[in-house]
């Protein structure tokens, strides 16, 4: 039964209350959904509530398989930078060494979302659970297109458009991968959101790097704020110069035209665009630390760059795009 007493009592929900509330509100009238989203917007969202909502949405997914040692790397979007889709590129690069379950969608806030790039390279989104397991076993990689495996977001789309405000759904995406990976690298559009994500990761017993900078990923030229979650939360600042040995001008990795942006990524994998390659490797590196492949981000970055320079990364891109 749907209970929205928290609205009238002006209080925060517990994690279990939030989970039950989300499950029950899915099929409520749009007027009720609007009241729910507006109340959260005015009140503010706590880590308990965000954790409960994300658990509910994962339960509502059409995927019911459990696979250990998966990693996702994802950004919130919303920085309006039109950078190349570095999290998607990094996920493909990382599949050379770890199992990746990339969760994403077509572009909403930017002109080119992760699914737009995957479609560009020829990836087939519709998969059975057997296909998902097969791809992970054979290629270390699967891309989970959010609307295909979870219809919940679509049920709120009309209300969100009419409200015209940032709702909890703007930040739920990175937390709702139906394969429930235990390791996550999340780029957040501001430090407050990054801190909230870190608290949620701790509550859900996950290992994570949460980053925020001038963009929703590790910046190649400015310091990034990092929350490292592994049984506790540790915050530190990351200077890209100390990792890459050079600063990359952000203008070299920003492109509004989707096709040109996608080709920057492909050139990076071919080792023809060193600035973009460095940017991708920088953002891939934390995932290798989470998985125990590297002891620190610098050595992880070196591994990622070597995988690009050796040609292995481009071969993996071709294999994932079903060209093999």
Curated annotation (Swiss-Prot):
Cofactor: Mg(2+)
Family statement: Belongs to the anthranilate phosphoribosyltransferase family.
Residues that bind Mg(2+) 2: 216-217
Residues engaged in binding anthranilate 2: 160
Gene symbol of the encoding locus: trpD
GO cellular component: cytosol
Pathway it works in: Amino-acid biosynthesis; L-tryptophan biosynthesis; L-tryptophan from chorismate: step 2/5
Note accompanying the cofactor annotation: Binds 2 magnesium ions per monomer.
Function: Catalyzes the transfer of the phosphoribosyl group of 5-phosphorylribose-1-pyrophosphate (PRPP) to anthranilate to yield N-(5'-phosphoribosyl)-anthranilate (PRA).
UniProt protein name: Anthranilate phosphoribosyltransferase
Residues reported to bind anthranilate 1: 75, 105
EC number: 2.4.2.18
One GO BP: L-tryptophan biosynthetic process
Pfam families associated with the record: Glycos_trans_3N, Glycos_transf_3
Entry binding sites for Mg(2+) 1: 87, 217
Alphabetical UniProt keywords: Amino-acid biosynthesis, Aromatic amino acid biosynthesis, Glycosyltransferase, Magnesium, Metal-binding, Transferase, Tryptophan biosynthesis
Quaternary structure, from the entry: Homodimer.
């Amino acid at each position: 039964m749907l209970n929205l007493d928290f609205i009238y009592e002006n209080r925060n929900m517990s994690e279990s209350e939030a989970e039950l509330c989300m499950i029950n509100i899915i099929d409520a009238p749009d007027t009720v959904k609007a009241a729910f989203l507006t109340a959260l917007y005015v009140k503010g969202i706590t880590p308990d509530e965000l954790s409960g909502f994300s658990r509910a949405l994962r339960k509502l997914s059409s995927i019911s398989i459990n696979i250990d040692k998966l990693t996702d790397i994802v950004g919130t979007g919303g920085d309006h930078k039109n950078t190349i889709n570095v999290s998607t590129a990094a996920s493909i690069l990382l599949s050379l060494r770890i199992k990746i379950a990339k969760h994403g969608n077509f572009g909403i806030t930017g002109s080119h979302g992760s699914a737009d790039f995957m479609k560009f390279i020829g990836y087939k989104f519709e998969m059975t659970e057997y296909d998902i397991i097969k791809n992970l076993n054979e290629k270390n990689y699967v891309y989970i297109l959010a609307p295909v495996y979870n219809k919940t977001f679509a049920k709120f789309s009309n209300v969100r458009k009419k409200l015209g405000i940032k709702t909890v759904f703007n930040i739920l995406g990175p937390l709702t991968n139906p394969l429930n990976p235990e390791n996550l690298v999340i780029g957040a559009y501001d430090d407050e959101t990054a801190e909230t994500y870190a608290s949620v990761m701790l509550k859900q017993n996950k290992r994570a790097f949460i980053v925020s900078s001038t963009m929703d990923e590790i910046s190649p030229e400015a310091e990034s704020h990092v929350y490292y979650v592994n049984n506790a939360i540790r915050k530190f600042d990351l200077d890209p110069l100390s990792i890459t040995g050079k600063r990359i001008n952000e203008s070299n990795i920003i492109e509004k035209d989707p096709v040109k942006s996608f080709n920057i990524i492909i050139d990076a994998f071919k080792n023809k665009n060193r600035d973009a390659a460095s940017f991708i490797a920088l953002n891939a590196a934390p995932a290798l630390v989470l998985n125990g492949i590297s002891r620190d981000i610098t050595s992880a970055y070196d591994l990622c760059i070597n995988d690009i320079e050796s040609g292995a990364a481009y071969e993996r891109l071709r294999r994932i795009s079903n060209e093999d």
